């Protein structure tokens, strides 16, 4: 039995589990910040045209994608997906970030470290995403520990997998995203003895490099605009309670 209590009272432990996203948005970081342990779900199928190899940044015309080109086969798991070595994605991303965030107040504080991360010899998408997530959490000041699902035994069916991961690490609560209805058998999960909570995320507003405000961008946007105040801005807009489903423990 693994125990990862991080200041939760009464021996409660909240775990959240999610696929590794590239330059994830604020809702992703909010969910990690609320948890005592974050498990990266890199063992499930890669989904093309979602958020595992792309995200959005602010531009003068609205927003644009930053996409990591990949080589993958249908049914391939995220941790098996390789980055296309012939594409110049690093240069394109860095050029876009430096151009569109040239007037961001904290550009010089964070972009050099992000550039150094980009310039490492990446071949595997999951490894890149995990490094980017770790960098973002450190830059924000989010201290939630991270483990990978591949470290633990778990069944393949989606709800069974979540139950197994929660039980293995000793979780008493599982924090799911708002889309839990689409992938979870809630009654069966609640019967496992782990309390189910649903994230309620309210997107913060803040001064961006361009007007009007554009929500749902990569978390790099808030970081470059507000710097050390980014985490408090994220937390200030947070509902005081989570939505609990059921009363099982």
What is the predicted function of each stretch?
Residues 2-249:
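Residues lining hydrophobic/aromatic ligand-binding pockets adjacent to catalytic sites
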């Amino acid at each position: 039995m693994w125990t990862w209590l991080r200041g939760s009272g009464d021996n409660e432990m909240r775990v959240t589990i999610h696929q590794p996203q590239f330059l994830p948005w604020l809702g992703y970081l909010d969910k990690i910040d609320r948890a005592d342990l974050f498990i990266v779900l890199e063992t499930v199928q890669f989904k093309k045209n979602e958020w595992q190899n792309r995200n959005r940044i602010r531009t003068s015309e609205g927003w644009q994608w930053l996409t990591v080109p990949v080589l993958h086969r249908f049914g391939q798991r995220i941790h098996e997906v390789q980055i296309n070595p012939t594409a110049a994605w690093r240069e394109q991303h860095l050029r876009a970030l430096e151009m569109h965030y040239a007037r961001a107040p904290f550009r010089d504080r964070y972009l050099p470290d992000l550039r150094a991360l980009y310039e490492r010899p990446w071949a595997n998408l999951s490894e890149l995403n995990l490094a980017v997530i770790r960098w973002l959490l450190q830059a924000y000041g989010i201290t939630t520990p991270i483990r990978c699902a591949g470290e633990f035994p778990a069944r393949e069916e989606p709800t069974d997998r979540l139950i197994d991961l929660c039980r293995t690490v000793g979780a008493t609560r599982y924090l799911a995203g708002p889309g839990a209805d689409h992938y979870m058998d809630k009654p069966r999960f609640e019967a496992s003895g782990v309390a189910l909570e649903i994230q309620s995320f309210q997107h913060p507003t803040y001064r961006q490099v361009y007007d009007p405000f554009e929500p749902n961008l990569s978390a790099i946007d808030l970081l470059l605009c507000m710097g050390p105040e980014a985490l408090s801005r994220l937390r200030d807009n947070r509902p005081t309670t989570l939505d609990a489903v059921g009363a099982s423990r």
